[in-house]
């Protein structure tokens, strides 16, 4: 065997193996990338659909059930409406960026998207802040609650909740106050970055998250402290009532007299009301905690990258933090259904009615089609005997 030819053939085989290995690695990488892209698309679509349908269920259930039409749920319904707008206005643009791997809507829509993102995030946390204040008066200061938390006051708070975030979203972003001059001059139509200056980062994050979050934490600490005190007093009162009842029974047995121990309806109503307020506070406290857990990573990232010029974050981490915050809009209806019996029963009833009405409509459509078929077949059969009768008559 020629050593030169042998070395050439060995080299060719080695090159062929390397080339095939590179092609296989490329195919495997493309397959993995394709699978991850499809999986990510499905997850993001699921979040959008859950947010829209779940919060629509909340709104319809409160409207249909009189038991849920209390002042606290005015804020819950308004929060659900804000979450629906997040799912319909904000999430689709972010989904488009992930799907198209770029921005295709131009500068104006980019500003609109960034403004809406800031606006609805601020609106959501201000709703939770209003709910915490409502629960604070209901549990810590129950005598002042009917005076302070009227329907008029609730509508004033809701108006402030919807109007005040405009000052840190649409106005500064469309006026160009939120960023630097260099960034405005170097903007491109195929990119939608939200690069903010340091004053705007501090002011917007404080109004949107840090100040309301601090208020909520302190109000809920006071709420749970008062709730624990009331429960301890309730258990002590129940224990004393049991001792008094036992003592009165012993005395009545000795005297041979009949003793009836009955609680007053007013005490029963107050007890049920207190338990209901505590359950509502627990559910809304869980909602507040879920909101903080979902949005805290993003705001830490937002402030740190805005104040630190050399701090960078991988794009995949940024996407995860954005969609973790968006997921909170889909999470609230699940929390209502799991932790609050009134909402759970209302959801079941609303879904059952929707399903029954759909079934009835489908059945009525089928009946109508059957009637049309019978009428059509009858019309087809009528001329035949009539024609035969006329023929016989002519004969």
Curated annotation (Swiss-Prot):
Subcellular location, record wording: Cell membrane
Protein name per UniProt: Octopamine receptor beta-2R
UniProt xrefs under PANTHER family: ADRENERGIC RECEPTOR-RELATED G-PROTEIN COUPLED RECEPTOR, OCTOPAMINE RECEPTOR BETA-2R
SMART domains xref list: 7TM_GPCR_Srsx
Cytoplasmic compartment segments: 64-74, 141-154, 224-282, 337-395
Species name: Chilo suppressalis
Phylogenetic classification of the source organism: Eukaryota, Metazoa, Ecdysozoa, Arthropoda, Hexapoda
Chief location of this protein within or outside the cell: membrane
Residue intervals on the Extracellular side: 1-42, 96-117, 176-202, 304-315
Gene that specifies this protein: OA2B2
Gene Ontology MF terms: octopamine receptor activity; tyramine receptor activity
